[in-house]
Amino acid sequence: MADIDNKEQSELDQDLDDVEEVEEEETGEETKLKARQLTVQMMQNPQILAALQERLDGLVETPTGYIESLPRVVKRRVNALKNLQVKCAQIEAKFYEEVHDLERKYAVLYQPLFDKRFEIINAIYEPTEEECEWKPDEEDEISEELKEKAKIEDEKKDEEKEDPKGIPEFWLTVFKNVDLLSDMVQEHDEPILKHLKDIKVKFSDAGQPMSFVLEFHFEPNEYFTNEVLTKTYRMRSEPDDSDPFSFDGPEIMGCTGCQIDWKKGKNVTLKTIKKKQKHKGRGTVRTVTKTVSNDSFFNFFAPPEVPESGDLDDDAEAILAADFEIGHFLRERIIPRSVLYFTGEAIEDDDDDYDEEGEEADEEGEEEGDEENDPDYDPKKDQNPAECKQQ
């Protein structure tokens, strides 16, 4: 038995010697090839990958990994850079305050144009032929003869129809053309919004805390007695002491609506529902009437109140976040460019912006696909652990 074991050991030793001889004869290229194959096998092992990722996380993905390993003297210099960054944020805050002052200054220059817009929409002023002259891009190649023919046909159509005053349903059309606003407008809101004459933005006075007010001007109507509905947005342009590096320009801190004086039976923000209740003992049935909230654009003027603690439930936070977005959109886009949202041209421009971003993303995807087809491509080399974590 011992002889058999010795024989097997001798054969094993001989095999190892043969392997060593073969390895010595292998070229450098073969050694590299085997190393590459071994690397591929390791990268396909989930346990090895997990261990490697954990180590990378400790070094790079968590800030403390690399930063904590720095010498103390280097950490001191990093702290100095942080203090410089705080000062940069403070300067940036002053920059935005001056931008707000410029907006207030130029609002005065814009106002005569917006006043003329208001007068045309509401049939107070009839623009002259010269003011109405407009040459769309598609008319560049149209002959004078065709233009004259089209003009005559338009005049005939105008004669057949009754003469409308101003631009009917201007603001309602704007709202319905913009997804962000049309989602808020219910069918029962539309008859009321037909009475909307104008939307204005007013900025806070110099030296006052940053804020702006949206004014919705209505003509007399059968729904409420208010001539103007307002929404005030309070803003802040200063870094938060507890987190100065998060500063990214002015932010809306809160908003206040107004009371709508609804006429009797015309409040579209409420609805009455009837429920039948059956008595368990006697079996009798009674009808109970209850008033509950109703979806409406006019809920925009009754935002959730923020308690002194600042704590809000998830629903209230979502409503306020959407409210702030809408207020900013009305101020920055709708009011200054309303005619382009009425015609739909601004919406097409917005869509083009999104399309360009989508095309860039598609091109990046194609490039990534080409890399994945490369047998020597290692996706781990291209990944930035910090970016992956943020996603």
Swiss-Prot record:
This protein's record includes keyword Cytoplasm: yes
Family: Belongs to the nucleosome assembly protein (NAP) family.
Major site of localization recorded for this protein: nucleus
Entry keyword set: Acetylation, Cytoplasm, Lipoprotein, Methylation, Neurogenesis, Nucleus, Phosphoprotein, Prenylation
Superkingdom of the organism of origin: Eukaryota
Annotated tissue distribution: Ubiquitously expressed.
Annotated segments matching region Disordered: 1-32, 132-163, 346-391
Positions of modified residues (Cysteine methyl ester): 388
Propiece residues: 389-391
Basic and acidic residues composition bias: residue spans: 1-10, 144-163, 377-391
Subcellular location: Nucleus; Melanosome; Cytoplasm
Modified residues (Phosphothreonine): 62, 64
Taxonomic lineage: Eukaryota, Metazoa, Chordata, Craniata, Vertebrata
Chain positions with N-acetylalanine modification: 2
Free-text comment on this protein's domains from its UniProt entry: The NAP1L motif is required for the histone chaperone activity. The acidic domains are probably involved in the interaction with histones.
Listed name of the protein: Nucleosome assembly protein 1-like 1
Organism, scientific name: Homo sapiens (Human)
One protein family per Pfam: NAP
Example of a GO MF term: RNA binding
